[in-house]
Amino acid sequence: MAGLEILSPEGFRLDGRRPNELRRLVCRMGVFTQADGSAYIEMGNTKTLAAVYGPHEVLNKAKARHDQALINCEFSMATFSTTERKTRAKGDRKSVEISMAIKRTFESCILTSNYPRSQIDIFVQILQADGGNYSACINAATLALLDAGIPMKDYVCSCAVSFINESALLDINYLEESSSAPQLTLAILPKSEKIVLLRLDSKLHADNLEKILDLAKKGCKDVYALLRRHVHDFAKDSLASMCT
């Protein structure tokens, strides 16, 4: 990244966006007929699939909870998802870390007490990686859970921010992630602004933390507006098709 200008003197990023702009967000729900719920999301060039199965009987009886559902999450990356073409074994450290982060995020948001002694499986896969993988997975999983009819406290919306050359950049891409600058990934419940995931990848001066946290919250709310509009349109189209 040496010598590469992330932000121009005119205030534009390499992809033409302003510092506080989201990448283009594309959503589709109901992409798998075999799953109880599914979704596909593009955040810029990062492309993600999510599928939800359940609630169903707990596969490992020893893990069953008498008062709530068990949330199982599995993250993977397609072998062609990055330019590195690096083979990532199932269950490698990074995949397990992301799986656990997504699991904990949704355990705090899904109304698990509605489904005692049952299991809900969330599978997410990165098809193409270009930055913001955590956020893309969380946003896709949210849509898939809504498609499955799983009740939640609210949408879970996520966005990543970086702090480069004294500027906070919203919804970072791969080149911006590769700058070694501090990066914050945030997921919130938009209506209450409750934080359900916060990851800071490197040290950041306390004076700058509030600035990037505020921008990340703004990004999450912008994502929420887009997801909510898509869910509304999807429900409207589904109802129309049932009536014809």
Regions found by a protein language model. Name each.
Residues 1-244:
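Polyanion-binding surfaces on beta-sheet-dominated domains and ring/shell assemblies
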